[in-house]
A protein has these predicted regions:
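Repetitive beta-strand solenoid architecture
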Residues: 37, 45, 54, 64, ...
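Sec-dependent bacterial lipoprotein signal peptides
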Residues: 1-19
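Hydrophobic residues embedded in beta-strands of well-ordered beta-sheets
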Residues: 68, 94-96, 172, 208
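Mid-chain, structured segments of secreted extracytoplasmic proteins
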Residues: 76-105
Length: 213
């Protein structure tokens, strides 16, 4: 089943994520124990970065040309739970696929990713409950999805891309002039000439922010 579905499932995921942080939404997450994993991959131009995460944050920043470096921080309320959910990092023909699984449906567990990648990497990032913070060029295909959380995309000030941004319950903020459809919960148009790439971001419950870096 896909990590992302709109409507009722998104709301359920949001409630589940908040309850994993404590008994109510104002509680501080009790994820005392952590485990750090790190791996580097050699890639070419316009490499692919595919990430799917059941809960947590995904942060992507510009790194060295030809290298994708992935740091995963597993977090859990109980030390014994750290071995009960998995992180996979697999080299593709020209890129990296990173995924997490929580087959036991544990609560109070998550994985935070800190990734550095070439500026021209093409991301496909999906998070069930959590946030995505991406900084890149916007070249090629760029896709970001979360059911409950936020998507932040930082692009060059002179970027030329198509954009399709949709939010089910929440807000969209964009720091570029857009030619096309601009509504509170949907933006479908172009920034600049739109010839260099495409940005797609979808959030069921939360916010989308697209801004110059």
């Amino acid at each position: 089943m896909s990590l992302f579905r709109a409507g009722a499932i998104a709301v359920l995921l949001l409630v589940t994520f908040l309850s994993a942080c404590g008994e109510d939404s104002t509680s501080t997450p009790v994820q005392t124990f952590s485990e750090r994993l790190e791996e580097s991959f050699t890639v070419g131009d316009l490499s692919d970065l595919m990430v799917s995460n059941f809960a947590g944050t995904v942060v992507v920043r510009q790194g060295s040309a030809g290298v994708i470096n992935v740091v995963a921080i597993k977090r859990a309320a109980r030390e014994e739970d750290l071995d009960q959910f998995d992180v996979q990092m697999v080299a593709l023909q020209n890129g990296v696929e990173v995924s997490t699984t929580n087959s036991l449906q544990l609560t109070q567990v998550s994985v935070d990713f800190e990734i550095t990648a070439p500026l021209d990497v093409q991301p496909l990032i999906q998070v069930a409950a959590g946030s995505i913070d991406y900084e890149g060029s916007g070249i090629g295909q760029n896709s970001f999805t979360t059911a409950a959380g936020s998507v932040t995309v930082r692009l060059p000030a002179d970027v030329n891309v198509e954009v399709l941004l949709t939010v089910g319950a929440g807000t969209i903020s964009i720091g570029f002039p857009v030619v096309g459809l601009v509504e509170d919960q949907r933006i479908d148009g172009i920034i600049g000439t739109g010839v260099d790439g495409r940005i797609e971001a979808s959030v069921a419950a939360g916010e989308i922010v697209v801004s110059p870096r």
